[in-house]
Amino acid sequence: MAEVLFEYVRQGACVKVTAIDTETQTEAVVVVPVGLSEKDMQTKALQKLVYLLKKKETE
């Protein structure tokens, strides 16, 4: 995972956070409460991205 881009879209009381691995073009999307810190939002999205990349390796 060379570089990860984050995109934030507010939807009412929630924020949709997308983490994109630029190397594999894999995307992970999480929906979190709007009150969460940016760091926590990124952490949750990154955890899901890592999970998806590991899952992809085993397939």
Description of each model-found segment:
Residues 1-31, 35, 39-59:
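Charge-rich, low-complexity N-terminal segments
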